[in-house]
């Protein structure tokens, strides 16, 4: 009896004039799921703590992020297929656009996503040719994202980001966060890479072509989330259950690989608003035949929240609603379906917030409540009340009568 966990990234919002994209979207299928299940709100980490997508997904799978999270870099790197070794220092990277004179650290960020560039494969090839005192690994992620790994003796993840995390600010120098030789050495290597990467990208033919077309150059990399790979017990060892993750986004694929899940990326799944939702839903339904837990990740709502695009987010929710229709035909005497988000990405904030997210659990044995609409304004009225992300899977396993008893 499997669990289907659907995580719609950044789905929920703070109201604008009393409305959110989710509350005003036409979504009969999402509303039907709310009507069929037990509803509530959820703090994926804890009240008032703004979750990352990585930490929240760890929590949703039952892993304490305060114990197992060591930075976004190694998870992102795992997601793009880099095998992280002991001592490696991994970063998450964005291709970005910078302007100004002088070194990379004198230049100002004008777009942290380089106009949402889609294909960076040629740029990645050029970056791999950079020579450093240590081995360099660079892999393409989804869209403007990438992963950068430094491999060598005497490195440390106790170093700062180079991403200022805002436009209009200068690129940051990497500085050691510990008073030791390893951190100082690593910071120096990161700064050397930053400058050399900028020189390679600024003069790359692809960027000259982009400039001629009036597009933003992807002429810098912004690094953040330095980390070394932690020891994480596999989901199978931890729970005795087989896990499958269906995702296109490198970070979520990385979470899956870190916990030992099988990861599936259906054809046409992109992690943006043009993703092949039909293929992802079909893959999830098929996976329920072979796995105990299937995590289906949907990314575009988060991207549209970061862009501050109310109408775009609303439209994508309506598209998602249409494409999940086949899930209503599942046998809920044998399957537990959970629909939720990993965090809020409000239109007015354009970033993650700690606002609790709506959640509904559908199974024939749930104590159905009177909620009939899936939204931020209705979910809190439901019978689940307010839960934590780490509670979610336990609740589902209890409904399926495969939870272990605590005590005599």
UniProtKB/Swiss-Prot annotation:
Required co-factor(s) are: Mn(2+)
Please state how the activity of this protein depends on pH.
Optimum pH is 7.1.
What's its EC? 5.4.2.12
What are the protein's GO molecular function terms? metal ion binding; phosphoglycerate mutase activity
Coiled-coil regions, chain positions: none
Q: Which reaction does it catalyse?
A: (2R)-2-phosphoglycerate = (2R)-3-phosphoglycerate
What is the recorded function of this protein according to its Swiss-Prot or TrEMBL entry?
Catalyzes the interconversion of 2-phosphoglycerate and 3-phosphoglycerate.
Q: How does it assemble?
A: Monomer.
Family membership, please give it: Belongs to the BPG-independent phosphoglycerate mutase family. A-PGAM subfamily.
Q: What is this protein called?
A: 2,3-bisphosphoglycerate-independent phosphoglycerate mutase 1
What is the protein's species of origin? Archaeoglobus fulgidus (strain ATCC 49558 / DSM 4304 / JCM 9628 / NBRC 100126 / VC-16)
UniProt lineage: Archaea, Methanobacteriati, Methanobacteriota, Archaeoglobi, Archaeoglobales
The gene for this chain is apgM1
């Amino acid at each position: 009896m499997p669990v289907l966990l659907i995580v719609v990234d950044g789905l929920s919002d703070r109201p604008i004039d009393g409305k959110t994209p989710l509350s005003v979207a036409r979504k009969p299928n999402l509303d039907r799921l709310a009507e069929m299940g037990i509803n509530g709100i959820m703090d994926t980490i804890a009240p008032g703590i703004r979750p990352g997508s990585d930490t929240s997904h760890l929590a949703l799978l039952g892993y304490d992020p305060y114990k197992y999270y060591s930075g976004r870099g190694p998870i992102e790197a795992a997601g793009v297929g880099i095998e992280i070794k002991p001592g490696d220092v991994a970063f998450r990277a964005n291709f970005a656009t910078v302007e100004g004179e002088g070194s990379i650290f004198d230049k100002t960020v004008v777009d942290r996503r380089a106009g949402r560039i889609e294909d960076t494969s040629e740029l990645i090839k050029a970056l791999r040719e950079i020579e450093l005192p240590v081995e360099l690994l660079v892999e393409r992620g989804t869209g403007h994202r990438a992963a950068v790994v430094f491999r060598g003796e005497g490195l440390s993840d106790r170093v700062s980001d180079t991403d200022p995390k805002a436009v209009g600010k200068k690129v940051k120098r990497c500085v050691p966060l510990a008073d030791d030789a390893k951190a100082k050495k690593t910071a120096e290597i990161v700064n050397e890479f930053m400058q050399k990467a900028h020189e390679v990208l600024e003069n790359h033919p692809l960027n000259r072509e982009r400039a001629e077309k009036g597009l933003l150059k992807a002429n810098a990399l912004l690094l953040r989330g330095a980390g070394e790979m932690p020891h994480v017990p596999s989901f199978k060892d931890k729970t005795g259950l087989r896990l499958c993750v269906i995702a296109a986004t490198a970070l979520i694929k990385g979470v899956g690989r870190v916990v030992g899940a099988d990861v599936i990326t259906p054809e046409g799944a992109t992690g943006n608003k043009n993703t092949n939702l039909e293929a992802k839903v079909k893959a999830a339904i098929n996976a329920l035949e072979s796995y105990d837990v299937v995590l289906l990740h949907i990314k575009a709502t988060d991207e549209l929240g970061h862009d501050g695009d109310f109408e775009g987010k609303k439209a994508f929710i309506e598209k998602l609603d249409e494409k999940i229709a086949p899930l209503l035909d599942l046998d809920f005497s044998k399957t537990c379906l959970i629909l939720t988000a990993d965090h809020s990405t409000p239109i007015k904030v354009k970033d993650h917030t700690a606002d609790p997210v709506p959640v509904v659990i559908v199974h024939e044995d749930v104590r159905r409540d009177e909620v009939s609409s899936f939204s931020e304004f209705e979910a809190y009225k439901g019978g689940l009340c307010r839960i934590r992300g780490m509670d979610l899977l336990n609740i589902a396993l209890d409904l399926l009568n495969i939870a272990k008893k605590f005590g005599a």
